[in-house]
């Protein structure tokens, strides 16, 4: 039974090697038809939004884990800190962080071009078939979760206001700058680095 499962995994891994990223051009459209491209786009969008929902639920998971590791009197504080990560991180990332992460700039820091929108930043960073708003939601929940990960180490060690300032800094500077290096065309991506899992 174990051997059969290992063989199936090996077959799947070999099959995925041959899947290539296809260009949606006029030749491609004439071969498969417009309906297939719409389906391709819909599946990619659903997949990105499903991934965003899973990452969003990580917020609740981290809140539960951290609450379990702390004393009962600090449970409300921990849950509020995890909620504030998303409440602070979302507007900060939409107003400034997205521009730092995906704006045209140098290899270290993107240029802020206004609030996160397709009109301000274009579509060059988008995966094939994924609309801007779905990509923005995906990146936003990752930004908030990045701030939440560290909150477990700060549980029962910081005051609430200090933690809110920390969350602001993570969402405004640390996550967008390090994200620009890899996903925004920064110096690490220019060296040929590819990050497939978001780590």
Spans of features found by a protein language model:
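Short, Lys/Arg-enriched N-terminal segments with co-localized hydrophobic residues
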Residues: 2-38
């Amino acid at each position: 039974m174990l051997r059969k499962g290992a063989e199936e995994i090996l077959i799947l891994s070999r099959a995925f090697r041959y899947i290539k990223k296809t260009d949606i051009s006029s030749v491609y459209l004439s071969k498969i038809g417009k309906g297939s491209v719409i389906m391709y786009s819909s599946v990619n969008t659903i997949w990105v939004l499903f991934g965003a929902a899973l990452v969003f639920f990580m917020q609740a998971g981290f809140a539960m884990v951290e609450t379990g590791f702390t004393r009962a009197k600090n449970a409300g504080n921990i849950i509020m800190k995890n909620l504030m990560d998303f409440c602070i991180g979302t507007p900060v990332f939409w107003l400034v962080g997205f521009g730092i992460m995906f704006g045209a700039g140098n290899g270290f820091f993107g240029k802020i071009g206004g609030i996160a929108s397709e009109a301000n930043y274009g579509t060059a960073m988008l995966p094939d078939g994924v609309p801007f708003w779905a990509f923005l939601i995906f990146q936003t929940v990752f930004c908030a979760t990045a701030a939440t990960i560290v909150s477990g180490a700060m549980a029962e060690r910081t005051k609430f206001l200090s933690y809110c300032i920390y969350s602001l800094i993570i969402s405004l500077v640390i996550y967008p700058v390090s994200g620009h290096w890899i996903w925004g065309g920064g110096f690490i991506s220019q060296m040929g680095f590819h990050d497939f899992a978001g780590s």
